[in-house]
């Protein structure tokens, strides 16, 4: 995972500098090539085996997909898009850029950070702040509570119903379906709390990524509330 992340970070860092130096006329081709290069590892690892089978080529190896690859791929594309579309200045220091790309509290479940937003707090000096540490620990405890006391408990009932070999009443399937949606909610919310809490221990506040999606009034509003940073990424 770290090797691929390092190589992809190095490529994105280089593309960012090249994009900024290139005249506007030549930027489009560079940007297109850069985006394809960022997507290639993700697509190759996720769909490489399927592509070989379609082509009739025997492929018996098991591809291991690194954790967080989807998030940091979108993060890199967003960084390059900000340089290409919005004229954002690229980061010239690779160590600082790699810190941005590999900041582990958000790399597994998001949010998908914008460089200008995360770098504001990531690169500044941090002093010990008891109040921030305390708030971070509260977030972590809430994350563990939602994961083990709610999501895991709901999963036991849901699995027992859907995996049962016996005849089950339709009402129980309905209840299991509702509980499954709540299980997904609790799972994602727990990850949000954990990533935010761990980041606060380092003095870095992550953006909100979850806003009570089950209170949405439309599918569009639901999606916007479920994964805020991804919705903003797609919009921009």
Would you name each region that the model predicts?
Residues 1-236:
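Membrane-embedded transmembrane alpha-helical bundles that form the catalytic cores
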């Amino acid at each position: 995972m770290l090797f691929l992340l390092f190589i992809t970070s190095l490529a994105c860092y280089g593309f960012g500098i090249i994009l900024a130096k290139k005249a506007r006329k030549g930027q489009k081709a560079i940007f297109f090539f850069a985006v394809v290069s960022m997507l290639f590892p993700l697509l190759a690892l996720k769909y490489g085996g399927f592509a070989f089978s379609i082509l009739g080529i025997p492929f018996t190896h098991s591809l291991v997909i690194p954790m967080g690859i989807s998030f940091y791929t979108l993060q890199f594309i967003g960084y390059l898009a900000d340089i290409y579309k919005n004229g954002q200045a690229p980061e010239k220091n690779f160590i600082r850029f790699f810190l941005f790309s590999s900041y582990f509290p958000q790399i597994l479940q998001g949010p998908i950070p914008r460089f200008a937003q995360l770098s504001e707090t990531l690169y500044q000096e941090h002093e010990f702040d008891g109040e921030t540490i305390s708030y971070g620990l509260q977030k972590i405890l809430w994350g563990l509570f939602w994961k083990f006391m709610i999501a895991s408990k709901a999963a036991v009932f849901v699995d027992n119903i859907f995996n049962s070999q016996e005849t089950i009443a339709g009402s129980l399937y309905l209840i299991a379906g509702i509980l499954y949606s709540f299980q997904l909610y609790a799972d994602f919310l727990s990850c949000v709390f954990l990533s935010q809490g761990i980041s606060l221990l380092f003095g870095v506040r992550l953006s909100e990524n979850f806003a009570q999606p089950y209170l949405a009034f439309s599918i569009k509003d639901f999606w916007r509330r479920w994964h805020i940073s991804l919705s903003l990424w797609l919009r921009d």
